[in-house]
Amino acid sequence: MLAAISGSYVIPAMYSLSPNPHSTPFQDKVFEDTYDTVLMAIGRRALTEETAVSNAGVKVIPENAKIDSDNEQTNIPNVFAVGDVLHEKPELTPVAVQAGKLLAARLYGNGTTQMDYQNVATTVFTPLEYGCVGLSEEKAEELYGADNLEIYHAYYKPTEFFIPQRNPQRCYLKVVCERAAPQKVLGMHFIGPNAGEVIQGYAAAVKCGLTFETLESTVGIHPTLAEEFTRVTITKRSGEDPTPQSCCS
């Protein structure tokens, strides 16, 4: 609950604030400071309790009241769920739309195609956008092990940043790959102008099994933002500085 934009705010429930993965709980405490911008990212919760799905025998996960299903079918054969109410599925409108269409096709049109919840692209539409598809570096390390990964990354200067002195570390990209050839791409991350437009195209490539060998052999369209993915060569393992020269874009 915001008491004042430039004053104090009260955290009525629970909030984690920590620079490391170990969260620190703050409950019912007051923090005071002055802010230029206040972002309320409170998320959502499933309304399965309000809709009384338990009366139909549908089981939900106690911790978040969501339904666990890989094919939208609940534990009750004739009850289905799509969208944000599903446990550990992307909370995105296009995901719910696609899953609903495929479910309707299976129920009424003899369709067989299941919703693919892997490698769903998404973008955070902040003033400098962040777009991604596939695994994060942390999740890839958890699944594959750090020694089995190669992380390519680079800062870059968009053509839109025509002022030479502008900070070259505002825009960044990362490609998470398997280390063994042909280095299958597991995730792509992009911070910069029009990130959503850039990632949308690469999302299809990732779903088709894009490899880094294919990526680096692709001729980029110059000058575009998307071509930066075809130019990245520096790995985190190398320890080299991924910052471009001040004269380069």
Please annotate each region the language model reported.
Residues M1, I5-G7, L135-K139:
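N-terminal glycine-rich dinucleotide-binding loop that anchors FAD/FMN and/or NAD(P) in oxidoreductases
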Residues A3, G7-E32, V38:
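Conserved beta-strand-loop-beta-strand element in the redox core of flavoprotein oxidoreductases
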Residues Y9, K59, D147-E150:
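Conserved beta-strand segments of alpha/beta enzyme cores
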Residues D33-G109, G201:
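FAD-site-proximal beta/loop scaffold in flavoenzymes
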Residues P94-Y117, A146-N148, V206-F212:
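Internal hydrophobic alpha-helix adjacent to the cofactor/substrate pocket in enzyme cavities
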Residues T113-E129:
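Flexible, acidic loop-helix segments that line cofactor/substrate-binding pockets
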Residues F125-S136, E141-S249:
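Flexible, glycine-rich terminal cap/loop adjacent to redox cofactors
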